[in-house]
């Protein structure tokens, strides 16, 4: 489903952004004026116009996405795919829970850090068992309670937790990664330099929509891989017109 600037701007009324599902805290209900929103939406619009509709996250079901979110820590997605392929028909929470940790380590070896990741997968699976491996039961938990709960699981940090919330369960928790930090520092948006600050900046300026967060993060990642690298390739970048890195060169 295509979501471009027009769809995002439809949430702007009388120079304010209205949440489709208002937050309990009044300060999140009537957010920032159009002038503070437009730079972020301009980035989204430029990326969307260039790359189109991207479909993320790769995975067949919520549990597979959760596994992928852990396996992708400190490695390339190609290595994750190799590890997932080695799990094959055993990639279910029931089978991972029953699998000896040594066997699991060997299966996920291509993903790197396989010993610690095997224990992280065991811990995550044990957490999921509390919900009888039922994704709908997880989704019924309020987000402000669910996120700290997931963060308490061994091996799950903020980026992994938000990836699980957003991609596995379809909940509106904006994912901040190295690509996001790099884009926002170079554009720049003055969003801050910490994970929490950047996440709050984005969530305060975008409609509270998992679909929009999903699309935006996917667009940032693909542009980060193609253009906004540590050593950027600015020619052809859809954001080069407003990028400080480009201006400085």
Model-predicted segments: where are they?
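Catalytic cores of DNA base-excision repair glycosylases
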Residues: 37-249
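Short, contiguous pre-domain boundary segments
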Residues: 20-33
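Ala/Thr-enriched low-complexity intrinsically disordered regions
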Residues: 2-4, 22
């Amino acid at each position: 489903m295509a979501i471009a600037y027009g769809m995002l701007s439809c949430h702007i009324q009388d120079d304010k952004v209205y949440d489709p599902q208002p937050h309990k805290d009044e300060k999140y209900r009537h957010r920032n004026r159009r002038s503070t929103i437009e730079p972020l939406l301009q980035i989204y619009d430029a990326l969307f116009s260039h790359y189109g509709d991207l479909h993320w996250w790769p995975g067949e079901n919520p549990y597979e996405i959760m596994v992928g979110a852990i396996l992708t820590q400190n490695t390339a997605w190609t290595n994750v795919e190799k590890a997932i392929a080695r799990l094959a028909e055993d990639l279910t929470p029931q089978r991972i829970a029953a699998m000896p940790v040594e066997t699991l380590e060997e299966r996920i070896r291509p993903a790197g850090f396989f010993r610690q990741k095997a224990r992280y997968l065991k811990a995550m699976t044990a957490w999921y068992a509390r919900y009888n491996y039922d994704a709908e039961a997880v989704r019924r938990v309020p987000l402000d309670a669910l996120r700290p709960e997931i963060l308490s699981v061994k091996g799950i940090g903020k980026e992994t937790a938000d990836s699980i919330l957003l991609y596995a369960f379809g909940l509106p928790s904006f994912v901040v990664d190295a690509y996001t930090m790099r884009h926002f520092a170079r554009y720049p948006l003055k969003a801050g330099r910490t994970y929490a600050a950047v996440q709050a900046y984005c969530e305060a300026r975008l409609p509270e929509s998992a679909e929009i967060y999903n699309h935006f993060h996917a667009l940032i990642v693909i542009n980060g891989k193609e253009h906004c690298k540590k050593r950027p390739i600015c020619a052809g970048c859809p954001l080069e017109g407003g990028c400080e890195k480009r201006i400085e060169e």
